[in-house]
Each structure stands twice: as structure tokens, then as C-alpha cells.
């Protein structure tokens, strides 16, 4: 393996930030992988909640786009991308819509915490460009995603999920079926 040659465009980009960006890329790809697993679980013939499937597929694509945006940043700043193995999702059977939404909320909170730590590191390394990038492209979107998932969980519980299959069916049809996702 050859070592990467030093970048001619690198300026005020600390090695710790570069490494943290690579870790964040891996986390975003992991999140995409988890959402992909959720999507195809709900697409199964014995689950058949097509709007849950569409919702989670959309989330998977968003997370992959987040990873790609970070890769582009890494190259723009003169860093080097070092991809790691992507961990498999903790489960293959997502049980029901409520459980999947709860797992998604936990995942989004984890991604958000990692982004907050990345922002803190960028602040400590006096990297205003990285701070602005994270603020502009990630932080508000994470807060909105966390709120949306929290709302979905609340509404599913109010409807009687997971005990009521009808609740999931109606939520799939009327809430997720009419969302922008």
C-alpha cells in the first residue's frame, strides 16, 4: 500500500478533523445501511407496509447523500478518505412500525451526537469552515429528523401500536402515504 501524497490544497485542516470526518462518513453509511434494512423489511409480503418501506428508503438515500457530501468536503479540504467496514444492522427483523421508528430515533440521536462532537472538535481546532459546513448542512436537518420521528412515535402510540395492526396500517396509509418523503 502506498501512502497518500500530501495535498497542495490543504489549509487549516487538522488531522484530527480529517480522521473525525472519516468516522462520520462511516456512521452516515451505517445509518443508510440500517434504513435500507428497514425499508426492505416493510416491503416483505408478510409485512406489506409500502409507505413505511418508502419512508425508510428515502431516509437511506438521505444518509448516503450525507456521506457523499462529507467525502466531497474531505477532498475539497485536502484530506484523504479512508473507508472502513460498515457494521451490519443490529437486527434483521424490525418487528413493527413503532419499533422501527424507535430504532430510527435512537440512530438519528446517535448521528446528531457525533455531529455535535465533530463541531466541537472543529471549534477547538479553530476551523470556521468546518463549523459552518456542519451548521449549514447537518445540524438543523438532524433536529428536524429527530422531531419528525418523535412525532411519528407519539402518533403510533396514540393509535394503539404495536398492539394494533390496524394502527400501523392506517398510519402507513394516511400519515406516511401523504408525507413528502
UniProtKB/Swiss-Prot annotation:
One of its GO terms (biological process) is negative regulation of ferroptosis. Residues 11-160 form the Ferritin-like diiron domain. The lineage of its organism: Eukaryota, Metazoa, Chordata, Craniata, Vertebrata. This is Ferritin heavy chain. Its main location: cytoplasm. It comes from Bos taurus (Bovine). Oligomer of 24 subunits. There are two types of subunits: L (light) chain and H (heavy) chain. The major chain can be light or heavy, depending on the species and tissue type. The functional molecule forms a roughly spherical shell with a diameter of 12 nm and contains a central cavity into which the insoluble mineral iron core is deposited. Interacts with NCOA4; NCOA4 promotes targeting of the iron-binding ferritin complex to autolysosomes following starvation or iron depletion. It is found in: Cytoplasm; Lysosome; Cytoplasmic vesicle, Autophagosome. Pfam families: Ferritin. Belongs to the ferritin family. Keywords: Acetylation, Cytoplasm, Cytoplasmic vesicle, Iron, Iron storage, Lysosome, Metal-binding, Oxidoreductase, Phosphoprotein. Gene3D superfamilies: 1.20.1260.10. The gene is FTH1.
Amino acid at each position: 500500500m502506498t501512502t497518500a501524497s500530501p495535498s497542495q490544497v490543504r489549509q487549516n485542516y487538522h488531522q484530527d478533523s480529517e480522521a473525525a470526518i472519516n468516522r462520520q462518513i462511516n456512521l452516515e453509511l451505517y445509518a443508510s445501511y440500517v434504513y435500507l434494512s428497514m425499508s426492505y423489511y416493510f416491503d416483505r409480503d408478510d409485512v406489506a407496509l409500502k409507505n413505511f418501506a418508502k419512508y425508510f428508503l428515502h431516509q437511506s438515500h438521505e444518509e448516503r447523500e450525507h456521506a457523499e457530501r462529507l467525502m466531497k468536503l474531505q477532498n475539497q479540504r485536502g484530506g484523504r478518505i479512508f473507508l472502513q467496514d460498515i457494521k451490519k444492522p443490529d437486527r434483521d427483523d424490525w418487528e413493527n412500525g413503532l419499533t422501527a421508528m424507535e430504532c430510527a430515533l435512537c440512530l438519528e440521536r446517535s448521528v446528531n451526537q457525533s455531529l455535535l462532537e465533530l463541531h466541537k472538535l472543529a471549534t477547538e481546532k479553530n476551523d470556521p469552515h468546518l463549523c459552518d459546513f456542519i451548521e449549514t448542512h447537518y445540524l438543523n436537518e438532524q433536529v428536524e429528523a429527530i422531531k419528525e420521528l418523535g412525532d411519528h412515535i407519539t402518533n403510533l402510540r396514540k393509535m394503539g401500536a404495536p398492539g394494533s395492526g390496524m394502527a400501523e396500517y392506517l398510519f402507513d396509509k394516511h400519515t406516511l402515504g401523504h408525507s413528502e418523503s
